[in-house]
Amino acid sequence: MAVSLWQQCIGRLQDELSAQQFSMWIRPLQAEMDGDTLVLYAPNRFVLDWVRDKYINIINQFFTEQMGSDAPKLRFDIGSRPSAPKPIQATAAVVKPKLESSPQKSQTSFNVNAPEPAATANHRSNINPTYQFENFVEGKSNQLGKAAALQVAENPGGAYNPLFLYGGTGLGKTHLLHAVGNGIIKNKPNAKVVYMHSERFVQDMVKALQNNAIEEFKRYYRSVDALFIDDIQFFANKDRSQEEFFHTFNALLEGNHQIILTSDRYPKEIDGVEDRLKSRFGWGLTVAIEPPELETRVAILMRKAQESGINLPDEVAFFIAKRLRSNVRELEGALNRVIANANFTGRPITIDFVREALRDLLALQEKLVTIDNIQKTVAEYYKIKMADMLSKRRSRSVARPRQVAMALSKELTNHSLPEIGDAFGGRDHTTVLHACRKIAQLREESHDTKEDYANLIRTLSS
């Protein structure tokens, strides 16, 4: 009875949560009765803690509404319920559609550019062993992506298939792909895990056509245990490659073999890619990887400095992190330059030294991102007048973009809250603070706001 009640609760949660939240946190749960207690099994500690912190009140409220004082107690545990290996499924709305093709699987390897038989799993896979979950710096900007990647590594071909990670350049998507691959190979050393850039897939297909080896190409790619393709947007306008990948995708999913894809944009926004592919990209879980927030940027710098054997003062790390915001690659490149200059000159790493070592980079960053530039960009994005940013109008169509612009100004510039308020028509600093908190809340609750904010950061940081 209580397990049936949980199925009803799943329906309620599916209605109330975003598709990403539901797929990420609710779909992996398994339920089983233990006396008068309903036990919910989570795949790992991260999911367990998140569900218990965020959704336990909603779940208990639903149980009470349905059964009153007879509502079951609720307990959380990690693992799979003993009586069945599969989770209780959600309603048909989230079930993957029937695949259009199911080519026969084969263990034959593709011959073009094939590795030597004695090659190791890492060499055969192109998986970089240096990219691990342990050295991936986690923050709010990439927390969901890392959690999803961890679950895929533990259970490839399971709930999140395909996993689609998207976001700007240098944010850690490739690191997560390799970390998943290393996790799978660690658990199953003989697993055939293949990582590649999308252009390599295209090149392999072209070579196969030239060498009359297209059947070997098909058998090779459709026989892997896990296929990770980076920058899938480069399939745009390559019709034959899209056709081959379409059938490869179908074959792998039918065999419950894991697929992970990355892109610089949301699947539906990828121009030049067929709708049937874009639709399939969203069958599993789609997660945004956003530019790292200040605390994460500092942590990245401190980790990188530690790996390089350098003692980086906290104030220097904060100085760099506050001024370079676009991506991890830029941060690491700046730190490498600072370290190289320090080693060459023998000078200690201070804020003044960093100002000198990065003067051209810092000058460019300050020139590109100004409050005025943010206001103009946001006004254009939301199709409102620039004057509305400074006006007293409170209609939602104007107030929300203004709040977004204030939040971006706090994140992307070094201006204080009073200075930002002055730039928005002489508003008080408390108004700016309220706007920042409101937008932070909406980014957690609203997929549209999260997307808008990420798009604007990419535009302003490019």
From Swiss-Prot:
Lineage of origin: Bacteria, Pseudomonadati, Pseudomonadota, Gammaproteobacteria, Alteromonadales
Family stated for the protein in its record: Belongs to the DnaA family.
Residues that coordinate or bind ATP: 170, 172-174
Region (Domain IV, binds dsDNA): 343-462
This protein's record includes keyword Cytoplasm: yes
GO biological process terms, semicolon-separated: DNA replication initiation; regulation of DNA replication
Domain-level remarks: Domain I is involved in oligomerization and binding regulators, domain II is flexibile and of varying length in different bacteria, domain III forms the AAA+ region, while domain IV binds dsDNA.
Database matches in CDD domains: AAA, Bac_DnaA_C
UniProt xrefs under InterPro entries: AAA+_ATPase, Chromosome_initiator_DnaA, Chromosome_initiator_DnaA-like, Chromosome_initiator_DnaA_CS, DnaA_C, DnaA_dom, DnaA_N_dom, DnaA_N_sf
Location of region: Domain I, interacts with DnaA modulators: 1-84
GO annotations of cellular component type: cytoplasm; plasma membrane
Gene transcribed to yield this protein: dnaA
Compartments, as annotated in UniProt: Cytoplasm
UniProtKB keywords: ATP-binding, Cytoplasm, DNA replication, DNA-binding, Lipid-binding, Nucleotide-binding
Chain positions covered by the region annotation Domain III, AAA+ region: 126-342
GO molecular function: ATP binding; ATP hydrolysis activity; DNA replication origin binding; lipid binding
Subunit composition and interactions: Oligomerizes as a right-handed, spiral filament on DNA at oriC.
Bilayer-crossing regions: none
Protein's name in the database: Chromosomal replication initiator protein DnaA
Region (Domain II): 84-125
Organism annotation: Shewanella woodyi (strain ATCC 51908 / MS32)
Protein task: Plays an essential role in the initiation and regulation of chromosomal replication. ATP-DnaA binds to the origin of replication (oriC) to initiate formation of the DNA replication initiation complex once per cell cycle. Binds the DnaA box (a 9 base pair repeat at the origin) and separates the double-stranded (ds)DNA. Forms a right-handed helical filament on oriC DNA; dsDNA binds to the exterior of the filament while single-stranded (ss)DNA is stabiized in the filament's interior.
